[in-house]
A protein has these predicted regions:
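Conserved catalytic cores of phosphodiester-cleaving nucleases, focusing on short active-site segments
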Residues: 6-21, 25, 32, 38-40
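A basic- and aromatic-enriched beta-loop-alpha substructure that forms the phosphate/nucleotide-
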Residues: 28-89
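A short, conserved structural fragment
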Residues: 175-186
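Short, cationic-aromatic polyanion-contact patches
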Residues: 185-198
């Protein structure tokens, strides 16, 4: 029963906390948004320390810092999976960049037992950034200030310090949310401009 599976329900509506695969929320959102305010909270690891647990003894070994850091731009790939709901006034989104400790069991199939291992737990230890997306105009937070007129995804990538594939995902979302618009092409690249709202 989809009504029994929400994370939090109070006088403000429903809060859904989803750490990945936002597409799994589609069925819930199609029901909940007809009657309730829904806030989707999507936490992403900014700084992560990984520790390994020996499953037979419980000993914790080799804590190390992960070289990968997420940025708020990395959320776009997941948000695109629920884009059909993002213009609904009852849906709000909160992106969290958090520091965390992650624990995995040394039970994988590789010689060091790390590949194919099972994640045991993730523990948040701090919040680095909170981004609230309560209406389409809030998505303008993702547009670097120096971009004004006639820019490409390569220009966007350089200004935002992200790779071009991520920039393309961000611009696809911003175009869908009617915050930027395609105004032409140069070679194979689309040219974008900021959408004016009066």
């Amino acid at each position: 029963d989809v009504y029994k599976s929400q994370d939090i329900y109070n006088e403000h509506g429903i809060i859904e906390i989803q750490t990945r695969q936002l597409n799994k929320l589609r069925d819930k959102l199609s029901v909940f948004l007809n009657e309730y305010q829904v806030r989707v909270v999507y936490p992403m690891p900014y700084e992560k320390y990984l520790s390994w647990i020996e499953p037979e003894t419980g000993d914790i070994t080799s804590r190390r810092k992960s070289p990968k850091r997420c940025s708020v731009y990395d959320a776009m790939f997941e948000l695109y999976k629920i884009k059909a709901f993002l213009k609904n006034q009852n849906l709000k989104v909160t992106l969290l960049l958090i520091d965390m400790e992650e624990y995995k069991l040394l039970n994988g199939w590789s010689y060091d037992k790390k590949r194919g291992s099972v994640r045991y737990d993730r523990i948040p230890v701090g919040i680095r950034k909170i981004v609230e997306l309560d209406c389409p105009q809030d998505y303008m937070q993702f547009v670097p200030e120096e971009l004004e007129k006639n820019f490409t995804s390569a220009d966007f990538a350089n200004a935002a310090h992200i790779d071009r594939q991520t920039a393309a995902s961000v611009l696809a979302m911003l175009n869908y949310m009617e915050q930027v618009k395609r105004v032409g092409k140069t070679g194979n690249a689309y040219i974008y401009d900021i959408e004016e709202h009066y």
